A protein has these predicted regions:
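Phosphate/NTP-binding elements of NTP-utilizing enzymes
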Residues: 1-237
Length: 237
């Protein structure tokens, strides 16, 4: 534990801290109307070209999730290879990013200081794999969406992270929870299939990988609940 003298702020830092605390009094303001999930899914302006290729089965499930009378904080997608699970996970994440983009001072939605960074994590085994699969697909979806190009442009100079500096928000690749320590992790996608061996043999390595996926799921779920659950319920979002 640090000594009190090590935590003492200089006058300049103290002023900065007081200014940041004052920022928390600024409320998040709606700057754009949020269109219904039905309209959003059918409109290439928001979803991009992928709006035309969403299976009706998945589309109805997405509508049910966002129109549920009870808030849904977790979605588990199952099915065989090529059934669209990764694409649907990305569309759900894209919708949440879109909703957040319709507010100014996004951190204030969760009673955080304006300078606080909001983070979403995309868990995969490694960056090269992530760029070829779900994380890379999400980045392309954002870049192909006219809405995001006009109203919520990311920093295109960065590919390892999807960053909106104007909103203090990012989607970051992560291979473990150590990549999210100290952040305000509001949500995540765990591409579980990429944590398993492609062989059906149960090996010690396969068990370790499975345990890692379970650990990531448990830790991120607990962190999200502790940091955001009460704030989310009380927010206007």
């Amino acid at each position: 534990m640090q000594e009190f003298s090590q935590q003492t702020l200089g006058l300049e830092n103290l002023v900065d801290t007081l200014v940041q605390m004052k920022d928390t009094e600024k409320k998040a303001a709606r700057i754009r109307d949020i269109v219904s999930i039905e309209e959003w899914l059918d409109n290439e302006y928001y979803v991009g070209p992928d709006a035309l290729s969403i299976y009706p089965y998945w589309k109805q499930h997405i509508i049910n999730i966002f129109n549920s009378p009870v808030r849904i904080n977790e979605v588990i997608l199952t099915g065989g290879l090529g059934t669209g699970k990764t694409t649907i996970a990305n569309i759900i994440l894209l919708r949440k990013i879109y909703e957040l983009s319709c507010y100014s001072n996004i951190p204030a939605l969760f009673n955080l200081m304006s300078s606080s960074k909001i983070m979403l994590a995309y868990f995969n085994l490694n960056l090269s794999q992530a760029l070829l699969t779900g994380y890379g697909q999400l980045k392309e979806m954002i870049d192909n969406s006219p809405y995001f190009q006009e109203h919520f442009m990311r920093n295109i100079k960065k590919d390892a992270e999807i960053v909106w500096p104007q909103a203090n928000m990012m989607v970051r690749f992560a291979s473990g929870t150590q990549h999210t320590i100290g952040t305000n992790l509001i949500g995540s996608v765990l591409d579980e299939a990429n944590f398993y061996s492609k062989t059906e043999k149960i090996t010690e390595q396969a068990v370790q990988i499975q345990d890692k996926a379970k650990q990531i799921y448990t830790e991120t779920r607990n962190r999200r609940k502790i940091t955001f659950y009460d704030k989310w319920r009380k927010s206007i979002y």
